[in-house]
């Protein structure tokens, strides 16, 4: 559960509606793979991940980024039940994919960075704080199965 004020909820909802979510997802996942190269081990089937330009242009990275951001978007619709919303994905990433749960936090930070880049001056410190709460809640929900 994420505790947002009414103003924070309005900020998150309003700003989220201004971005192309698919682009945010693709760029955030790409940045994760570039900035934290050890995360690439989970994506060995994605082909060429040899350089930043290869990663950012990789169609499989873009497609998976879209999938990731669609799940994030679902979370935005269920902020009061993130654990329930992400229960299946938490189980999948824990039991089958064996993803280090710290990566969820790192990806959340990449989403915030990309939002800041795309929204510019509209992404105020208060907006960033609201989105940080959301991505922290999503990361916690995704890591729930690990506890």
Curated annotation (Swiss-Prot):
Keywords, sorted A to Z: Acetylation, Heme, Iron, Metal-binding, Methylation, Oxygen transport, Phosphoprotein, Transport
Keyword Metal-binding: yes
Taxonomic lineage from the root: Eukaryota, Metazoa, Chordata, Craniata, Vertebrata
Family: Belongs to the globin family.
Complexes and interactors: Heterotetramer of two alpha chains and two beta chains.
UniProt domain Globin: residue ranges: 3-147
Residues the record lists as Phosphothreonine modifications: 124
Free-text function comment from the UniProt entry: Involved in oxygen transport from the lung to the various peripheral tissues.
Descriptive protein name: Hemoglobin subunit beta-2
Species this chain originates from: Rattus norvegicus (Rat)
One example of a Gene Ontology biological process annotation: hydrogen peroxide catabolic process
Intrachain disulfide bonds: none
GO terms, molecular function: heme binding; hemoglobin alpha binding; metal ion binding; oxygen binding; oxygen carrier activity
UniProt note on tissues of expression: Red blood cells.
Keyword Phosphoprotein assigned: yes
Residues in the signal sequence: none
Result for mutant: residue 21 to P: In strain: Sprague-Dawley
Residues found modified as N6-succinyllysine: 18
